[in-house]
């Protein structure tokens, strides 16, 4: 899931091109620009968070696409229960990511307001698949973090930079990470 076109940076576009040049199949899903702008404003007014709907779309897109394309396994990066302390996302073990649907990002405030803001049809991209859809598709999500002894934001940034990722030049005080 990417940012809406007006929020995409040259660094982000170059990093995406780099991943493709490494031989990865890449499928890009981006929210519609006008709907995204409308939802960002509504999200800011209601939650004080301009990025809430972008995060909802990010978390929801991956399993929706996997179910649609009959991909049985998603390898997810960070374990939100460990990395950011969202215990509702904790699974049966450190690798189990099947409780992402319980993340505060996806549950806090619901999504009815999104339907009201842009309509049911346009809001489907913001709906995280329910457990029944997961079970029917036999979809499993696993966190990658526990497979690496040195999983951290710093180590991941170093590894990414050494393998072709272009990092943002701004200071952490500006970017937040």
Give the positions of each predicted feature.
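Nucleotide-activated chemistry modules centered on ATP-dependent adenylation/adenylyltransferase
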Residues: 2-177
